[in-house]
Design a protein with these regions (language model features):
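A cross-family phosphate/adenosyl-ligand binding-site feature
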Residues: 2-69, 74, 79-84
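YjeF_N-associated NAD(P)HX repair module
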Residues: 66-173
Length: 173
């Protein structure tokens, strides 16, 4: 599991903990930062460590016997090209022979537009939650998301009652 610093990184800790709980061997690589994690991500990190999980620096030598890379580096908040250190991790993952599953959105793909302003994960599968992000269906998404999987997490009826920011305009007015 390759994981980042924000809420998508929290998702990476959850995936790692759940995989370990069912007997899957996990190596978790995390970016170091002076900034504190958001509360939910920090709780997920703590749960991973309390379950006996280890966190490895992202610059370790990767094992060749990797069966799956889970991309939880960058999430839907990305607005620009990934920093150089993240770009190097993305390039390393893309060059590894193991398949890649992206959590929510491939790192480097902009959630609103589907643009790829820099390095981007070339996922074999992308698992997204709650709502389909426009960037998963437009721009370069077709080239980098692989097979797209969606789960509303049971929020369908709640989402149906929400107002959107979008408005329709009539040419007749």
């Amino acid at each position: 599991v390759k994981q980042g610093l924000y809420n998508n990184g929290g998702d990476g800790y959850v995936v790692a903990r759940l995989a370990t709980a069912v007997g899957i061997e996990v190596t978790l690589l995390a970016q170091e930062s002076d900034k504190p994690l958001p509360e939910e991500a920090a709780l997920a990190r703590e749960a991973w460590l309390n379950a006996g999980g280890e966190i490895h620096a992202s610059n370790i030598v990767w094992p060749e016997s990797v069966d799956l890379i889970v991309d939880a580096l960058l999430g839907t908040g990305l607005r620009q090209a990934p920093r150089e250190s993240i770009s190097q991790l993305i390039d390393h993952a893309n060059s590894h022979p193991a398949p890649i599953a992206a959590v929510d959105i491939p790192s480097g793909l902009l959630a609103e537009t589907g643009a790829t302003p820099g390095a981007v994960i070339n996922a074999d599968h992308t698992i997204t939650f709650i709502a389909l992000k426009p960037g998963l269906l437009t721009g370069k998404a077709r080239d980098v998301t692989g097979q797209l999987h969606f789960d509303s997490l049971g929020l369908d009826s709640w989402l149906a009652g929400q107002e959107t920011k979008s408005q329709r305009f009539s040419a007749e007015q």
